[in-house]
Amino acid sequence: MLLRLDPKADQALQIAALGHDIDRADELRKVRRADYDDYDEFKAAHARNGAKILRSTLAKCGVAGSIADEACRLVTLHEVGGDPHSDLLRDADSISFFEVNMPLYYQREGRDETMRRCIWGYGRLSGRLKKIVKKITYEDETLTQLLKNAIQQACLKD
């Protein structure tokens, strides 16, 4: 997804895009949603943990320190952005949820949690990507309608 948004993304940004959710692959070290009352606190802890795990992995692979430092900085910020590179990573991650992950998320988490996640995810999109997400449809019309409802609710919050 990152390279669709910026075909010239540098190496650190590409590494961050590939590794931003690395903590989810380790059952023993991953951050669990159930341990947090606040979703944003959970996401911040997930981002910090992912950066920590990625740093260790990159060191073992011999990645140059400056590239590893930037990749880990970006992973730490991938949920919130804050500068052009981390904003781009956040956008790539966000649009990927809607284009790729939402149907599986719906199967795993159910309607209410998917609605909540869609509202949250839509709210963090840049204006450019909000226009793209508004055009997304799914084979399952239930999901298309859920997304439309989530967008309406997210717009009411703004």
Tell me the role of every PLM-derived stretch.
Residues 1-10, 19, 63, 78-158:
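Divalent metal-dependent phosphate-bond-processing catalytic cores, especially two-metal-ion Mg2+/Mn2+ enzymes
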Residues 13-14, 44-51, 89, 118:
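Hydrophobic alpha-helical segments
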Residues 36-43:
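Short histidine-centered catalytic/ligand-binding loop motif
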